[in-house]
A protein has these predicted regions:
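Helix N-cap / loop-to-helix initiation motif
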Residues: 15, 32-33, 49, 104, ...
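A glycine-rich phosphate/pyrophosphate-binding beta-strand-loop-alpha-helix module
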Residues: 40, 88-144
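N-terminal glycine-rich anion-binding loops that anchor highly charged ligand groups
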Residues: 8-54, 62-70, 288-289
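Beta-strand segments within the central parallel beta-sheet cores of soluble alpha/beta enzyme folds
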Residues: 54-57, 72, 136-140, 217, ...
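N-terminal basic/disordered segments at the start of proteins
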Residues: 1-13, 77-83
Length: 343
């Protein structure tokens, strides 16, 4: 591992096969945690390449638990996180809106690493526990058209890496790899990164992984979500073609707003924000969710344009369908918890 650390520290990019070897060493319990941390920090300082990201994703997926589900049009809207904007959990809220609009959502997520509340933290604050077995995870997907995969449960080899990431306390290559390692076979994906210079490379990684259609966003102000604060950079992956474009909130009929208007807090505070949105409280939080969910519906082929997607997302909330999805998942979680106690 030290030889890879030294090479990356002097700015050397690793070839795909070399990164395969380095990735396997990271997951090897015999490798010193300090060496893994040094490698992750060196990669971050150098700047990760598409080959390095794709290689680590391949190794992680090979170690993940196998999930048997029918090959339907499953979608994930998990972002990379780690943008430092301290906003509420936009993609988690958007997942319920997407499901309310008819998308089949298999959302990958984790606890907080470099934010105040990760996806799993806010789900628990909403009343949804994240310790479902794999069978329960699939049952929820089949029953409600939405499920949440807590990364450590489906990537058991990530336990030690997770502890190292917590110690580092800032984004690493694992943030980039997270959205790429959902064990459920995906047809479409909407994901965000906070590196506008890397959107095209990230889209090429998704193409290598076999996505038929996907949208990658690098949001205004350095967000890993579509932002109301200005121009957002996108790449659309459609049947092998990579198409860059840009968009503002004004372009789809939404009001612009600074990032400070959508600041979040801890898990409990973010859960309250999400419930307020689903109860139809309009404002920047609401607009941010329908903006992102609308893009997701366009990515999933349910809307012909992003503006049409925003209208569908708005209807998902105002009709009560998004809240119904949330309540249904909470009820499922409560039922599973009661069974566990009874045992």
């Amino acid at each position: 591992m030290r030889s890879f650390v030294r090479r990356v520290e002097i700015g050397e990019h690793l070839m795909y096969e070399e990164m395969l070897e380095a990735s396997k060493l990271m997951f090897n319990e015999q490798t010193e945690s300090r060496d893994v941390a040094d490698f992750l920090l060196a990669l971050s300082k150098k700047g990760e390449t598409a080959h390095e990201v794709a290689s680590l994703a391949a190794v992680m997926k090979s170690f993940a638990l196998k999930v048997n589900v029918p090959r339907e049009t499953f979608m994930d809207n998990c972002g990379t996180g780690g943008d430092g904007s301290n906003t509420f959990n936009i993609s988690t809220a958007s997942a319920f809106v997407l499901a309310g609009a008819g998308a089949s959502i298999a959302k990958h997520g984790n606890r907080k690493i470099s934010s105040d509340a990760g996806s799993s933290d806010v789900l628990e604050a909403l009343g949804i526990h994240t310790d479902f077995s794999l069978d329960e995870t699939i049952e929820l997907l089949e029953q409600e058209g939405i499920t949440f995969l807590y990364a450590p449960n489906v990537h058991p080899k990530m336990k030690r890496i997770g502890a190292i990431r917590q110690q580092i306390g800032k984004p690493t290559i694992f943030n980039l790899v997270g959205p790429l390692t959902n064990p459920i076979p995906l047809k479409t994906q909407f994901t965000g990164i906070n590196r506008p210079d890397f959107t095209m490379e990230y889209a090429s990684v998704l193409r290598m992984l076999g996505r038929e259609r996907a949208i990658i966003v690098s949001g205004a102000g350095g967000m890993d979500e579509a932002s109301l604060a200005g121009q957002n950079a996108f790449v659309l992956l459609d049947k092998g073609d990579l198409i860059p474009f840009s968009l503002t909130a004004d372009d789809v009929g939404l009001n612009s707003a600074p990032i400070s208007a959508i600041r979040g807090g801890n898990a409990k505070e973010n859960a309250a924000i999400i419930r307020a949105i689903f109860n139809g409280i309009r404002g920047p939080h609401f607009d941010t969710v329908v903006f992102n969910a609308g893009i997701g519906l366009f990515a999933n082929g349910q809307a012909g344009t992003i503006q049409e997607g925003v209208k569908q997302a708005t209807d998902s909330i105002l009709s009560g369908k998004a809240l119904q999805k949330l309540d249904a998942v909470v009820a499922f979680s409560t039922k599973i918890s009661a069974k566990a106690v009874a045992r």
